[in-house]
Structures are given as structure tokens and as C-alpha cells.
């Protein structure tokens, strides 16, 4: 699991769902939370939270697209297996672990030092209260 600490800067809620914007060292990370602000104490502006996402929930791109949760980085390390590959991407000093199929790595022409864009779906970012 990857964990990035940040502070909630905005909450947009409707029908028991919230779109939460968290300011982090990477930039703004957006997450969808299945609770109303009154139900989850940490879903409030200025609250410190952890943004958590699995290594398998990260998509790497070689070209920039117009999307939220898109962060530029450089591949710091790459362990290529027959089927799966594990990568570490440095995004503004934050090390993000990524798992891709080795076929994806080959198709994208990825290697150590390659500049990439990391894309996270807001639906796959989990927010957790950060100890004050």
C-alpha cells in the first residue's frame, strides 16, 4: 500500500457521497468517500488525513493527459518478473510503489530513469484520519 499524508482542503457532498480534495506533497489528490461529512469526522476542511492506495491501482502513462490525480515522476527502480513487475516511481520526493504486468512495462518501454505520469482513480483512494 502507498500512503501520502495531506490536509483536506474541500469537500463536495451529495446523496451520501463526498468528493474530497486533499493537499499533499504531490499536489491535490481527489478521493470519493461513501459517507457524509457528519458521519466521518475526518471528512472536514483542514483535517489531516492519509491518502492510501494499492500498488495495483496506479496507472502509468508516457504522455500527459487532462485528468485529476495525475502526477509526474521518474522511475527510480524496476524489478521485472516474467508476469509482474514492481516499480518505484519518485514523484516530488515521494516514493510510490506500482505493480504492472511485465507486458505493460514492455509496451510502454519503461526502464529506470524513464519519466512517466502516474494516474490514480478517485474511486481507489482511501482516506484515513491522521493522528494529530
What residues fall within each predicted segment?
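Glycine/charge-rich catalytic "coupling/switch" loops of P-loop NTPases
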Residues: 2-5, 10, 37-74, 103-132
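Tandem CBS (Cystathionine beta-synthase) repeat/Bateman regulatory domains
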Residues: 7-10, 20, 27
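Short, conserved beta-turn/loop elements at beta-strand boundaries and strand-helix junctions
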Residues: 11-17, 78-84
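Residue-level structural signal for beta-strand termini and adjacent loop
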Residues: 14, 35, 81, 101-102
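A generic beta-sheet turn/junction motif
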Residues: 15, 24-26, 53, 82, ...
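Short, acidic/hydrophobic/Gly-rich beta-strand patch recurrent on exposed beta strands
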Residues: 19-25, 32-33, 86-92, 99
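A short macromolecule-binding patch
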Residues: 28-34, 52, 95-101, 119
